[in-house]
């Protein structure tokens, strides 16, 4: 769910579905280090740094999240850092920040509702846009449209079987 919050300035914000449960389980504490490995609009990140005087490192590969990260950096200077990359690169990204140990990790895997809601991203069937489906449109050249229209039948079946987890793909 994406909403506008107005606390003196507008803060477009995505509310994670299980925010309370995740924060309760994570139990953020002062002077600890946390990672939100799928930053998105920063819902988990904001809740973590609001609960404790801690340091939070956020990871995302989608350049469109920078507008949310800028707001977080303004709200929580010296406590929030966005690292552009994939969550699979967490070790390298943290090493670049000279972080060798963390106290907690949030990982909300999957396509975000923001990507589905933005028709031009090509993740949704609800709009008449090109089939794109790239997480980072600046970094990756091949689109879902290219794959669907140019890959042979066997390759498409293999993609559907392996990544779509459809065992009957043939």
Q: Predicted regions span which residues?
A:
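S-adenosyl-L-methionine-dependent methyltransferase catalytic core, i.e., the SAM/SAH-binding region
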Residues: 1-170
